[in-house]
Amino acid sequence: MAGLKLQAVTKSWDGKTQVIKPLTLDVADGEFIVMVGPSGCGKSTLLRMVAGLERVTTGDIWIDRKRVTEMEPKDRGIAMVFQNYALYPHMSVEENMAWGLKIRGMGKQQIAERVKEAARILELDGLLKRRPRELSGGQRQRVAMGRAIVREPAVFLFDEPLSNLDAKLRVQMRLELQQLHRRLKTTSLYVTHDQVEAMTLAQRVMVMNGGVAEQIGTPVEVYEKPASLFVASFIGSPAMNLLAGRVNNEGTHFELDGGITLPLNGGYRQYAGRKMTLGIRPEHIALSLQAEGGVPLVMDTLEILGADNLAHGRWGEQKLVVRLAHQERPTAGSTLWLHLPENQLHLFDGETGQRV
């Protein structure tokens, strides 16, 4: 196994604008890190820099304690799995998996042993003589992973490998990737725009935005304690409710438009009188009663999802979404009385957007 270190790496195409701002990341031996963010945030560019397919403008990359910043891709000890399977259509599964080792001059016996072991791990034993056209999308992706596994790399790099699969296959392949990593324990860096993939696969998640690592943490950490408004709005489905307002002059309550006031769980006296953004996830809002101090919300629409429902309404000009139990189906125009637990409230600075 081998660790991976990015040390203040940057990328600029024109020498002026940095598409990757100075970024430092330490990936431990055997760790599975997922880089997630919207299109254009720099995650695939960063992955290609690690692979050696894009030059690093400044900073350094280390793999297995060796500086690889200027090394050719073939010398870095990495193997990539792409969104497109890139299999040779005229070759069998076995030949596709063996080809990279063959052109490196590895002996036939050793190649055969590695292909056999990778096929066993990926349950491709009975498909080795088939051509890619005879395989399903999931099987083709397994062959692409097998081609990477036989190289026995120090680091696996995954560039949105499940994007071409349908929803059912993506779920299946997520489970298979988890099992594969538990078995191989190879250091892995994985890129996706899909937060579900990020949360289910990662040991740690790096949320990227505009070439910046907004937050690096476990899936639980980025869900429970988002470091910024961007992370709060990106992680979670539906997204966290974000409500503009101000902390009252005593620092004890948060004041929203329309005269709605919510109690704060102490510790905010230093922010008294300041404009802030309050966040709460739809699943953390509970139904209450007017007599119990519930806050009213007139419901505009109801989304029935099956396992649960989403109620949509407004406080003034600000939208609010509440996740309801399956049996709760209020009608449009009805008033819901809500309880927002103090320990589930998040506050973000009104100017910087950072968590306070």
Curated annotation (Swiss-Prot):
Binding site residues for ATP: 37-44
Coiled-coil ranges from the UniProt annotation: none
Name of one Pfam family that matches: ABC_tran
Span of domain ABC transporter: 4-235
GO MF assignments: ABC-type glycerol-3-phosphate transporter activity; ATP binding; ATP hydrolysis activity
Catalytic activity field: sn-glycerol 3-phosphate(out) + ATP + H2O = sn-glycerol 3-phosphate(in) + ADP + phosphate + H(+)
Keyword Transport included in the entry's annotation: yes
InterPro entries: AAA+_ATPase, ABC_transporter-like_ATP-bd, ABC_transporter-like_CS, ABC_transpr_MalK-like, ABC_transpr_MalK/UgpC-like, Mo/tungstate-bd_C_term_dom, NA-bd_OB-fold, OB_MalK-like
Topology class, membrane: Peripheral membrane protein
Main localization of the protein described in the UniProt heading: membrane
Location in or out of the cell: Cell inner membrane
GO CC terms: ATP-binding cassette (ABC) transporter complex, substrate-binding subunit-containing
Keywords linked to the UniProt accession: ATP-binding, Cell inner membrane, Cell membrane, Membrane, Nucleotide-binding, Sugar transport, Translocase, Transport
Enzyme Commission identifier(s): 7.6.2.10
Domain of life, per lineage: Bacteria
GO biological process: carbohydrate transport; glycerophosphodiester transmembrane transport
Matches recorded under NCBIfam families: PRK11650.1
Classification via PANTHER family: MALTODEXTRIN IMPORT ATP-BINDING PROTEIN MSMX, SN-GLYCEROL-3-PHOSPHATE IMPORT ATP-BINDING PROTEIN UGPC
Functional note: Part of the ABC transporter complex UgpBAEC involved in sn-glycerol-3-phosphate (G3P) import. Responsible for energy coupling to the transport system.
Assembly information from the UniProt record: The complex is composed of two ATP-binding proteins (UgpC), two transmembrane proteins (UgpA and UgpE) and a solute-binding protein (UgpB).
Family per record: Belongs to the ABC transporter superfamily. sn-glycerol-3-phosphate importer (TC 3.A.1.1.3) family.
The protein, known as: sn-glycerol-3-phosphate import ATP-binding protein UgpC
Organism of origin: Escherichia coli O6:H1 (strain CFT073 / ATCC 700928 / UPEC)
